[in-house]
């Protein structure tokens, strides 16, 4: 009986790994009815730029770009997107910008964002955005480098497993980032005396 269990163990491990990898994506997408690869959780990518806020797109007004679906509030936004999609596609495949400098692909809610030099960055929370803004330019440079050299074409689960196991040298925990925020700006929810540029 023990021999059977031992011989089954590698197969069970393989099945577990395959189950974990199933559904992995190189982009942060969700499934919503007829749109199994929905970007930005259905928010209009153009509205972040033109309205300065996250706005849910109409499921009837949509476009495909690089294998994913984007929804729009109106046809004019869809046309703007289709004319220059690179202007509106979110940085880092729609994953959280605060994970990018650590070569991590963290999920986002799509409502917390910042536009820097015309580029859309998304965050999982206001706190992660605040931490990222402390060293915004460095975080963009690191995030861009890791995205192109390592994370862009890797599925998020194996990538995150790898980088949580083998962290980049400059990795900081949320607690360390919050302590740095407090050291620089005071209490946790205080706005900085001088807002980071961007």
Which residues are covered by each model-predicted region?
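Short, well-structured hydrophobic secondary-structure segments
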Residues: 67-74
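Bacterial N-terminal signal peptides that target proteins for export
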Residues: 2-13
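N-terminal non-cleavable signal-anchor helices
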Residues: 7-9, 18, 169
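Beta-edge loop/turn motif
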Residues: 74-77, 125
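Bacterial N-terminal signal peptides
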Residues: 12-23
């Amino acid at each position: 009986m023990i021999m059977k269990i031992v011989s089954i163990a590698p197969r069970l491990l393989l099945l577990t790994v395959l189950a974990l990898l199933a559904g992995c994506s190189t982009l942060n997408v969700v499934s919503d009815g007829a749109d199994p690869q929905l970007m930005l959780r259905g928010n209009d990518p153009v509205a972040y730029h033109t309205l300065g806020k996250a706005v849910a797109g109409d499921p009837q007004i949509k476009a495909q770009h690089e294998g994913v679906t984007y929804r729009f509030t109106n046809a004019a936004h869809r046309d703007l997107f289709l004319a220059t999609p690179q202007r509106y596609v979110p940085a880092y495949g729609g994953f959280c910008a605060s994970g990018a400098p650590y070569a991590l692909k963290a999920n986002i809610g799509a409502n917390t964002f910042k536009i820097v030099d015309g580029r859309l960055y998304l965050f999982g929370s206001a706190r992660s955005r605040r931490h990222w803004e402390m060293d915004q330019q460095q975080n963009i440079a690191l995030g861009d480098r890791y995205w192109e050299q390592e994370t862009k074409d890797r599925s998020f689960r194996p990538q995150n497993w790898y980088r949580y196991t083998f962290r980049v040298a400059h990795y900081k925990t949320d607690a360390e980032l919050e302590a740095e925020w407090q050291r620089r700006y005071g209490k946790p929810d205080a706005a900085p005396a001088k807002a980071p540029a961007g």
